[in-house]
Amino acid sequence: MSDIIIAFILGIVEGLAEFLPISSTGHLILVGHLLGFEGERAKTFEIVIQLGAILAIAILYHKRLVSLCNIKPLLRKEKKFNAFHVFLGVFPAVVAGLLLHDVIKTYLFQPYTVVIGLVAGAILMILAEVKKQEATACSLDDLTYRQALTIGFFQCLAVYPGFSRAGSTISGGLLAKVNYKTASEFSFLIALPVMVGATSLDLLKSWKYLSVDDIPMFAVGFITSFIVAMLAVVTFLKLLEKIGLKPFAYYRILLAILFTLFVLL
């Protein structure tokens, strides 16, 4: 199979899975294994296509991101969504990521740990659905600092491969009395700085594995991931309010079984 076709397939996988509660890491490892695309070059490729997904969110939410640069609501102590909400949602994961980055990359990016993350994340999502109460935050402007910080702590779970950033943060939002749409949008916004920081750090360390010959493949993967992520996020927001997290949780358990059969055994 040609590199361009592999790039196209993995770009679709990344674009679909990055902001859905199904674990992009688990999918990329499984599909990469089935395609025979593994090793350091594959890891560097995954970093590049993540940037495509990040760009999609930056464009979809560019107005909200620009509004965060306005510090007047923060200075006036207005009850309105502002940069401090994002800071509270990001800070715990940044600390966890910096402290555990090398340990995670060295020891936790293994197939069996991803299976554990898939199942553990599924259990959390089911529990969140069962335990959720009537939402008090039905828009980003309703979000309290305490709710933002709670979701931020749940994002720390996503440093474990296979757990899923969207799965952990949306679950945390439901448990903190935030509705589906608001929890999802906040999840996307706080993912941006964390992902930009993590992918930049990874790219600096993986730069030596890139060559000029890789540019066409990496470009196809990046563009595909960007387009698919744009479509996936818009569709997901509409779908989540109708079906909730449980179908995604059951899918994760199925993926863990497939992962075990095709990768571990």
From Swiss-Prot:
TM annotation in the entry: 4-24, 42-62, 84-104, 108-128, 184-204, 217-237, 245-265
Assigned GO CC terms: plasma membrane
Pfam families referenced in this protein's UniProt entry, alphabetically: BacA
Domain of life: Bacteria
A GO term for molecular function: undecaprenyl-diphosphatase activity
InterPro entries the record matches: UppP (IPR003824)
Reactions accelerated catalytically: di-trans,octa-cis-undecaprenyl diphosphate + H2O = di-trans,octa-cis-undecaprenyl phosphate + phosphate + H(+)
PANTHER family, sorted: UNDECAPRENYL-DIPHOSPHATASE
Protein family membership: Belongs to the UppP family.
Name of protein: Undecaprenyl-diphosphatase 1
Record organism: Bacillus cereus (strain ZK / E33L)
